[in-house]
Amino acid sequence: MTQRLVYRKNPDFPNRYISPEKLFFYLQANYSDHIQKVGQSFLEKPIFNLRMGNGKIKVLAWSQMHGNESNATHAMLDLLEIFKHQPELMHQLFSKISLDFIFMLNPDGSEKWTRRNALDIDMNRDFLKLSSKEFRVLKKIAETGSYNYALNLHEQRTIFTTDGENPATLSFLSPAADHERTITETRKKAMAVISRIYENLKSEIPNQIARYSDEFYPTSTGDNFTRLGIPTILYEGGHFPNDYKREGTRKYYTIALYEGLQAISELNGSTENWETYKQIPENKETHFDVIYRNVKLNTDFECILDIAVQYKEEILDGED
């Protein structure tokens, strides 16, 4: 009988904010045999790669390319915690795949809780210019590692919904490699993985899984990795109902990460059932955090309107 993954939260990282120093200490203390420093940031913070598994299918993943998107880092930390309690799942998975997981690609932005790096560069739009020291680390690893799949792990704002009512707690994308958005074999391989994730999670978070727009961006990471022939799966963690700390998102992001790796281990380049990808509803940008209805303005004439508010997430000094 196949054992199912039982979600566990990593107790060492209870909060949304993750200090780079705390993360580095944790990895060195607990996974010294699996981590390697692969580069450093503009402010000379280390960038670590965690390597697990000896399978033939090679997977590259990275978290916090945008410093204020910590859910993917949490997801991998939670998955490591789960594997402590369910080692058979770990052994089964990593007998088929080899995973290189780059933790916190943007440690400078992660420390300050900013999307961009210390030079105010959005690394997800830096593929052609290569202006950021950190992105050059990722690009070199991707181009020399002979990877079969890549996982580009991000978060999205609370504005996204699947149907105008439910939030898009998770969104996925197989990025296009051209303006025509041609569905190539490389894209189909990524779509097949996303389809497996969707089928396995849609009953747990019904109407909360969406498909991100596949508009082509010539300078973005996923689009160019697809052009290189690497099937790339974009993860976007979004809002979970009544949960601005994204604890629910964290849970299902972790499960989706595992399901994605498991799907890769089983598909091994197959495009089986890739068409299911088209059944996933597209993201819609229609949500706000708060809407004040029928607000009467203090004007010389009668003016009544609705005011929509979008929250801005900030980290306060002394809090994490």
Segments from the language model and where they lie:
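Short glycine- and acidic-rich boundary segments immediately preceding or forming the N-terminal edge
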Residues: 1-47
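Active-site/substrate-binding loop(s) of hydrolase catalytic cores
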Residues: 56-58, 65, 70-207
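Single, functionally critical "micro-switch" positions that shape active/binding sites
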Residues: 43, 63-65
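C-terminal accessory segments enriched in acidic
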Residues: 1-17, 145, 173-320
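Short glycine/proline-enriched loop/turn "hinge" motifs that connect secondary-structure elements
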Residues: 52-53, 113-115, 224-230
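Short beta-strand-to-loop junctions in surface cap/lid or active-site-entrance loops
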Residues: 48-56
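Conserved beta-strand scaffold positions in the cores of enzyme catalytic domains, especially
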Residues: 35, 49, 101, 150, ...
